Amino acid sequence: MSVTDAELLEIREKLVKDETSEALILAKKAADKSPKEDGRAFELLGEVYAELADVKKARSAFKEAVSRSKNLTNDQGYEKYLWLAQINDNGSKALKLYQKGVTILERLLIDKGEDADLKKKIQGAYCSIAELFMTDLCMQPDAEENCELYTKLALQIDATNAEALQTLASMRISQQKIEEAKDALSKCLQSISRAATEDSVDLPTYAVRTSIVRLLIEVEMHEEAHQLLVYLQKEDDQILDIWYLLGWNCYVEAQNLQEQGNGSEEEIKELLMNAKFYFISALGVYQKIGWDDEGIKSHIQELLEILNGLGVPNMDEENEEAEWETSENEEEMDED
């Protein structure tokens, strides 16, 4: 017994439609009846588990897919290598997996000609490899050279792609070329705005846009960071990281204004009040959704202690005080 192309296509369609429960049932059935030399069903099963955030089962399925594909002369399953690379915590092994996936993608692109989806996959892989050389493999002698190379390759595919521009900005920050990083981030925001306006498939994922926010804060583009965060919040207001970053952005901006002596006392106070509001809101979301990251909770609590120590009022307290002062002034005017 073997699995048919039609069965595999149905699983893929379920995945595209986010019907993961149905996809899981079909993928398990397909994997059970797949011959030893066919890893396609296991590759899809791995993708389903990855979508369900079951990393352990995803890794097992992808490894089985790789094992069954060893003797194939024309392996077309690049996804298993890219996914395994993403969840591999060994930089050198992750690099080899990415390169294997890219090799397959490049071959498929030659066979199929112009294919936007394949190009996007290759571009994403190039960005991931560049990130590896900025993180896990940063101590290698040729790390900076390779980072430049893969970032350049990604931008050659599409110079307006937000993920590629984000990678460029991240690299420039690591090189202390802040103005060049800001330029890349400005172009990145233009790309995001254009994709959002056109409701395009080129709109970066929520996670990518959140990473872009962190870079914006790092280079002190606070207004742009706030605007992007507000947009992300409108998409989903139950994401803890967004509330935390809204607060962190205000807090860091207030610190910068104080250190540089560029802001008025009122402006700094307002930023710190906003930061406190966002941090309190973040704790509310934390409790509501049962988030399991104790680290971010501890940091928020630490920041709130600092703000309380500075005597920063809650927003409702400030509003009540303002209303009381207004009422008192009105009474004095009436007496006059």
From Swiss-Prot:
Q: Where are the TPR repeats?
A: 39-72, 75-108, 110-143, 162-195
| Species this protein is from | Schizosaccharomyces pombe (strain 972 / ATCC 24843)
Q: Enumerate the InterPro entries for this protein.
A: TPR-like_helical_dom_sf, TPR_rpt
Chaperone as a keyword of this entry, yes or no, is: yes
Q: Quote one Gene Ontology molecular function term.
A: protein carrier chaperone
Per the record, the similarity remark reads: Belongs to the ACL4 family.
Q: Does the keyword ATP-binding apply?
A: no
GO CC terms, sorted = cytoplasm; nucleolus; nucleus
Q: What are the start and end residues of every segment in region (Disordered)?
A: 316-336
Please give the Gene3D superfamilies that the UniProt record associates with this protein: Tetratricopeptide repeat domain (1.25.40.10)
User: Where does it primarily localize?
Assistant: cytoplasm
- What is the protein name stated in its UniProt record? Probable assembly chaperone of rpl4
Regions crossing the membrane: none
Q: Cite the entry's keywords alphabetically.
A: Chaperone, Cytoplasm, Nucleus, Repeat, Ribosome biogenesis, TPR repeat
**One record GO biological process:** cytosolic large ribosomal subunit assembly
Localisation: Cytoplasm; Nucleus; Nucleus, Nucleolus
Query: What's this protein's function?
Result: Acts as a chaperone for the L4 ribosomal subunit encoded by rpl4A and rpl4B, required for hierarchical ribosome assembly. Shields ribosomal protein L4 until timely release and insertion into the pre-ribosome is possible, once ribosomal protein L18 is present.
